[in-house]
Amino acid sequence: PAIGKPVRQIHVWQRDERLPGDDGFEPGPTALSEEVGRLLAEKMPRESAAPPPEVNRVSRPGSQVMDCVLVDPQEWWLGVHEASSIPARWPGGVCPLDDASPGVSRAYLKMYESLEWSRMPVRARDLCAEIGSSPGGSCLALLDRGLRVLGIDPAEMDEEVLSHPNFTHIRKRGRDVRRRDFSEVRWLMTDINVAPKYTLDTVEEIVTHDSVRVQGMLLTLKLTDWELAEQIPALLDRIRGWGFGYTRARQLAFNRREFCVAALRQRTSRRPKTLQKFKKHRRPTRLDGI
């Protein structure tokens, strides 16, 4: 953090007591964190004419932020950080969901966060494919962005997704789909409950085919064994070897025992400023811990 730079924002969050999705728990601001933030803002010294610091708002790039982690009622951790990256701008590193209510499954939340974190330059009417799409939470998040979506999964999809005019269901496993069906796909997403090697085997067969022109990928890779975390650098190198030179990984706030890989062929691609956000009509539903 820059010494002497004024603190204009405060981020307060509680330690996660459960995995995301367990018993309805999801990370993010709570009534307690908001109240503690308000009290800290009132007590923080400032110039007489200066407004109190903002509490649990998305920080401006480069701003100085005071952190307070509520470990338990008797233990708080205090610190300061500079909002030098997208997750560093989010309170507690948790992607804000605005007023959206996820539907179908909590995969909706994971896709929302992966798009916000990666700044993947998707545009309305682009064609994307998701391997492992059932029951359709991720697909619904993509459809709400104005994308056209191929959902690839032998299992059934939710009726809300199936009825969307921009959705097509291919009831097959990813490696059983004809390569020409991917010829117009610009973005590839995966969320398959298998070890990372098997996910990447399927993806490699697709994106290295002569007829396929995928420009970017968001891959959810499962840590079926915690020791697999040691292989993450090698997994990223493998993806780069397919021509995706700009590749990075992060365990997102809404991830469970898994992490997200964002991969682009060209780093010069930029996300449009007018990207369509989530629609307000999403009905609340019970989320399964997947």
Tell me what each language-model feature is.
Residues 1-290:
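SAM-dependent transferase fold signal centered on methyltransferase-like domains
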